[in-house]
Design a protein with these regions (language model features):
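Short helix-loop "hinge" at the ATP-lid/N-box region of the Bergerat-fold HATPase_c
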Residues: 138-139
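Conserved catalytic submotifs in the C-terminal HATPase_c
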Residues: 82-87, 104, 109-118
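Short acidic helix/loop segment immediately C-terminal to the autophosphorylated histidine
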Residues: 38-45
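Short conserved segment of the HATPase_c
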Residues: 169-183
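Conserved micro-motifs of the catalytic ATP-binding
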Residues: 76-81, 119-122
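Short alpha-helical segment of the dimerization/phosphotransfer core of two-component systems
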Residues: 56-62
């Protein structure tokens, strides 16, 4: 309908504005700090922090660019999935180590509820990308709460559960989160945890390339759980 088309166009316009802002902000920060270092405007005892901030902003830019590149690769069927068996628990331990500081910066506690080794059949790098993206979303929309990751065996599949005690979503929001241009809470787009909005559509497509499934359970004001299943089979998917 015309109304639906108008909504999509407005989401696209807002997405482009957000993406431009999210690219410009780290570039401006990096440029300002470089000028400060060049002209010795940053005190000696603050230079280390300035360098760390530039590294963080550079990583943020790389992530934004990679998300856009991945989305285009998926859209044009140029991405390859090579599924192998690996220790999923160990992979999740590494993710928790990687993201704990970010979670704690938002007042959150990040837990891995699985201790026994459990094998996963997946493309290792894409598995990590899927889990990291969802955990980062949980951090973004949770304050002074908890985020739990669990791994379990199902029937001919391995299941990852990622739950948080964050703001939650309505049924309408759950239906829309896979839209490339949709944001669950536009009012939070300028927080220091803001992302480009491409993450969940990429996650959904990567899970589909694994012949897996992704489901969401959420209650407004109480939190969200993502349930991702990976079949126990080795495949190569173009």
């Amino acid at each position: 309908t015309q109304e639906t088309l108008s909504e999509v166009q407005e989401r696209r316009r807002q997405f482009m504005a957000d993406a431009s802002h999210e690219m410009r902000t780290p570039l401006t920060t990096i440029n300002g700090l470089l000028e400060g270092l060049q002209y010795n405007a940053i005190p000696e005892n603050q230079k280390e922090n300035a360098i760390k901030l530039m590294q963080n902003e550079t990583a943020r830019l790389i992530r934004l660019v990679n998300e856009n590149l991945d989305y285009e690769k998926i859209r044009t069927n140029q991405i390859q999935i090579v599924v192998k068996k690996f220790n999923g628990t160990e992979a999740l331990e590494n993710i928790v180590t990687q993201l704990t500081a970010k979670a704690e910066a938002a007042g959150n506690q990040l837990y891995l509820d699985t201790t026994e080794p459990i094998d996963v059949y997946a493309d290792y790098d894409r598995f990590v990308q899927v889990v990291v993206n969802i955990v980062q979303n949980a951090i973004q929309f949770t304050e002074n709460g908890e985020i739990h990751i669990a791994l379990e065996k199902g029937y001919l599949e391995t299941i990852v559960r990622i739950s948080d005690t964050g703001i939650g979503m309505t049924e309408e929001q759950i239906l829309n989160i896979w839209d490339r241009y949709y944001k669950v809470d536009p009012s939070r787009k300028n927080t220091k945890y803001g992302e480009s909005g491409l993450g969940l559509p990429i996650v959904q497509q990567l899970v589909r390339l694994h012949k897996g499934k992704i489901n969401v359970e959420s209650e407004l004001g109480k939190g969200t759980t993502f349930i991702i299943s990976f079949p126990d089979v080795e495949i190569t998917e173009n």
